Amino acid sequence: MSSQTPTAQNLSFVLEGIHRVKFEDRPIPKLKSPHDVIVNVKYTGICGSDVHYWDHGAIGQFVVKEPMVLGHESSGIVTQIGSAVTSLKVGDHVAMEPGIPCRRCEPCKAGKYNLCEKMAFAATPPYDGTLAKYYTLPEDFCYKLPESISLPEGALMEPLGVAVHIVRQANVTPGQTVVVFGAGPVGLLCCAVAKAFGAIRIIAVDIQKPRLDFAKKFAATATFEPSKAPATENATRMIAENDLGRGADVAIDASGVEPSVHTGIHVLRPGGTYVQGGMGRSEMNFPIMAACTKELNIKGSFRYGSGDYKLAVQLVASGQINVKELITGIVKFEDAEQAFKDVKTGKGIKTLIAGPGAA
């Protein structure tokens, strides 16, 4: 991997192929419309999708065919604004929503812009990501951070936005019992959002005890470590150990692992709600008989939509969710490749990469 250039104007972390990355000085982006702003990117979180592109060169139909800047969980400082920008000014600290919809297709007009047919999403081929010094995006996809939210915390508005969308899909209401499978960053944040929405019992499920220990301190009221027994047995044990009666109200899978999907269906009460937030294999077996006979409400969840980022910022600003606890490391920009290697091995919970030239 080539080393970074000290005099670079817009140093970027570029994926060329599987396990092949480089630092490249790219042109400073320009305003594409009067409604755009240019942001000096200060912090970027490493997401599982970034690591997957680095490790495999593709995610499903999205294949890296040309060099692509990685990263999409970012925050920064506004350095330039378009002539029509009214909600931001130079110097504002912002969280950056990295997916820009066309605003014209049927899903966009229906208010589901996360399903936009022409979505331009950062670090999803063929679009460059945010691991660069500068990035351009529309003003309404930048969320001004109050003084109570630091720039490192601002980078976590992206995974928190994902969690907000998942929990909204589940329609979690006060007094409910929610089971969350997968205690990675998104799963942990789902626990926190469910708590903020009034869930009275939140059970975090994972096979790694350290993650369960953290989940219990962070937002979960209970934890469950599944055995290698069939999903029905794990579900029965979870119900018994937590006195869930006929089952949980809501099950959220943030792991994408087939045994979790099965256990999630079986742990629900009749009429309960299941939301698939984690992505695993493109196809897997599914307990359709249990889903039908219990008349479950089953939904998918993809990224985030209208109001999700805004609510994420509000939940942190109000003190209901403390995302700072998830940040287990901040590395220099020149150490980005090693950070990717560390994240692949499961080191830490959320690692941030500081922008070029930052301490």
From Swiss-Prot:
Source species taxonomy: Eukaryota, Fungi, Dikarya, Ascomycota, Pezizomycotina
UniProt xrefs under SUPFAM superfamilies: GroES-like, NAD(P)-binding Rossmann-fold domains
Binding positions for Zn(2+) per the UniProt entry: C47, H72, E73
Protein's recorded name: Probable D-xylulose reductase A
Species in which this protein is naturally found: Emericella nidulans (strain FGSC A4 / ATCC 38163 / CBS 112.46 / NRRL 194 / M139)
Gene3D superfamilies xref list: Medium-chain alcohol dehydrogenases, catalytic domain, NAD(P)-binding Rossmann-like Domain
Biological or metabolic pathway of the protein: Carbohydrate degradation; L-arabinose degradation via L-arabinitol; D-xylulose 5-phosphate from L-arabinose (fungal route): step 4/5
Record's keyword annotation contains Metal-binding: yes
EC number: 1.1.1.9
Summary of the function given for this chain in its UniProt record: Xylitol dehydrogenase which catalyzes the conversion of xylitol to D-xylulose. Xylose is a major component of hemicelluloses such as xylan. Most fungi utilize D-xylose via three enzymatic reactions, xylose reductase (XR), xylitol dehydrogenase (XDH), and xylulokinase, to form xylulose 5-phosphate, which enters pentose phosphate pathway.
Cofactor: Zn(2+)
